[in-house]
């Protein structure tokens, strides 16, 4: 790398349209994306070697004047035209805070700092206050699409002050994925940490839907299908249209992938450790939703599925000690006709579980918006439209969701947009859950989705009536009455005999 100079010469000063801090899994591809769009990009990374290598490699394609590297934050700032615009692409948490601290030290008044990490929306709101109190400007902006999306065009979820967004908008829109109608997959989500809030719940939905597809795969395996046969089922579902999506596509690839290191031609999934990592956004989403009083059982179960996968030694030990629980294999269909029926039931189980998960996701977003004043709800149709390309959630089911919020922004629950599908598919979902329960196949998100759909469409919950009275017995907590189907405003206590625990 000796031929690469990171010296900031006068001809380089003020030439970069945008700066990228962090040339890693996301920062490198996004830099190349912006170079493709004709922007001059300044880069900084903790490793000078990484900067030198990146500049040396890509200046051959884009020219030395288009990609500019710097060794220090001070030199990095000199490369940028004013007002400076800097995107942070480093791990969330302390690394992000360290970068912001250094940028605040070196940038000038009115310069813009954009954090693209998976940060908690409350943290983004605090950062915005801190940065803007120092005379700089701040946006929190989530990114979806992974490294490939960053390279070819991701979906972006900015949130903060509108005037700040207007300054960075041309660059972000140019780099964003484009939907089939040509619109960039980015929209201003709302105030404060709104962008990070949307990305948080985007990730929670991703957790749930990935787990639903994984549970569908495991169920099909239990029906006796191998990887290629499972691919056949998934392809037939994709061709039906409603479930066509990026997450179906990647599940299809996983199902048929052979293990290159196996001599017997077996599938890679058979040799993959059954432990799912996570970065915390799913858990945050569930915690905040529950704090706001919103039930999100499918989203919660997706988090729990990951947590249970990570305690593998405990699971293996329990498996050895508790064979009576283990020995309940999912019964394979007895005939081709029965298999066809089981697979059709599973189709509806997947469809309705995804619908239930998205319903919970958007109920949570609206409740969090109301609680924290993020001004997201009015933007939901446009936000959902940003999921259409460059985004892990992209899929055909987004269309009826977008239409539902456009036609009725106050729709009580997104489930109301799926009335016909619920009527058609609930028997299949119930039958699938019964088979899974009797066959000992864990499918927490599908089962939780059935619970959500069943509970949230009941006018009276008998179990809730019992628990309300139980609380009055032991704690005199009081209960409301039902009169003509309506809940009374006053509370009551019944006369109970003394029962000392």
In which residue ranges do the predicted regions lie?
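NAD(P)+-binding Rossmann beta1-loop-alpha1 motif at the extreme N-terminus of oxidoreductases
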Residues: 2-78, 82-84, 106-110, 147-151
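Glycine/threonine-rich flexible loop motifs
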Residues: 85-102
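Rossmann-fold dinucleotide-binding core
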Residues: 97-101, 114, 120-232, 240-266, ...
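Interdomain hinge/lid region at the active-site interface
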Residues: 196, 221-225, 240-355, 403-445
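Small-residue-rich helix-loop
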Residues: 237, 241, 369-407
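C-terminal amphipathic alpha-helical interaction region
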Residues: 423, 428-501
């Amino acid at each position: 790398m000796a031929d690469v100079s990171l010296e900031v010469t006068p001809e380089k000063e003020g030439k970069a349209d945008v700066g990228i801090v962090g040339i890693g899994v996301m920062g490198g591809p996004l830099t190349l994306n912006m170079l493709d769009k004709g922007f001059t990009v300044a880069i900084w990374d903790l490793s000078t070697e990484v900067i030198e290598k990146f500049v040396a490699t890509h200046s051959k394609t884009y020219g030395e004047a288009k990609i500019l590297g710097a060794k220090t934050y001070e030199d990095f700032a000199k490369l940028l035209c004013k007002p400076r615009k800097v995107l942070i692409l480093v791990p969330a948490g302390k690394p992000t805070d360290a970068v912001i601290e250094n940028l605040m030290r070196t940038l000038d008044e009115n310069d813009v700092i954009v954090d693209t990490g998976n940060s908690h929306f409350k943290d983004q709101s605090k950062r915005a206050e801190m940065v803007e109190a120092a005379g700089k400007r701040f946006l929190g902006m989530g990114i979806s699409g992974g490294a490939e999306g960053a390279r070819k065009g991701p979906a972006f979820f900015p949130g903060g002050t509108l005037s700040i967004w207007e300054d960075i908008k041309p660059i972000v829109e140019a780099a964003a994925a484009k939907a089939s109608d040509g619109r960039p997959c980015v929209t201003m989500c709302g105030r404060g940490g709104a962008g990070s809030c949307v990305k948080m719940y985007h990730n929670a939905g991703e957790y749930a839907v990935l787990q639903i597809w994984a549970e569908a795969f495991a169920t099909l395996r239990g029906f006796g299908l191998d990887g290629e046969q499972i691919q056949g089922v998934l392809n037939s579902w994709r061709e039906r249209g409603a479930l066509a999506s990026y997450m179906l596509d990647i599940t299809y690839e996983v199902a048929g992938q052979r293990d290159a290191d196996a001599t017997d031609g077996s599938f890679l999934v058979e040799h993959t450790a059954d432990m799912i990592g996570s970065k915390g956004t799913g858990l945050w989403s569930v915690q905040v939703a529950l704090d706001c009083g919103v039930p999100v059982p499918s989203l919660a179960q997706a988090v729990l599925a990951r947590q249970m996968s990570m305690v593998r030694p405990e699971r293996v030990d329990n498996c050895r000690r508790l064979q009576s629980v283990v020995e309940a294999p999912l019964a394979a269909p007895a005939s081709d006709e029965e298999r066809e029926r089981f697979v059709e039931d599973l189709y509806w189980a997947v469809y309705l579980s995804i619908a239930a998960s998205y319903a919970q996701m958007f109920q949570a977003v609206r409740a969090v918006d109301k609680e924290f004043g993020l001004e997201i709800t009015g933007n939901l149709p446009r936000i959902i439209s940003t999921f259409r390309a460059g985004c892990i959630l992209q899929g055909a089911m987004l269309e009826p969701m977008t239409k539902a919020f456009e036609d009725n922004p106050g729709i009580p629950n997104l489930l109301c947009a799926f009335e016909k599908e619920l009527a058609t598919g609930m028997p299949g979902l119930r039958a699938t859950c019964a088979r899974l329960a009797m066959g000992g196949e864990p499918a927490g998100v599908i089962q939780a989705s059935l619970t959500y759909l069943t509970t949230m469409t009941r006018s009276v919950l008998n179990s809730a009536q019992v628990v309300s009275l139980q609380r009055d017995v032991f704690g005199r907590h009081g209960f409301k009455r039902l009169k003509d189907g309506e809940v009374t405003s006053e509370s009551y206590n019944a006369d109970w005999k003394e029962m000392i625990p």
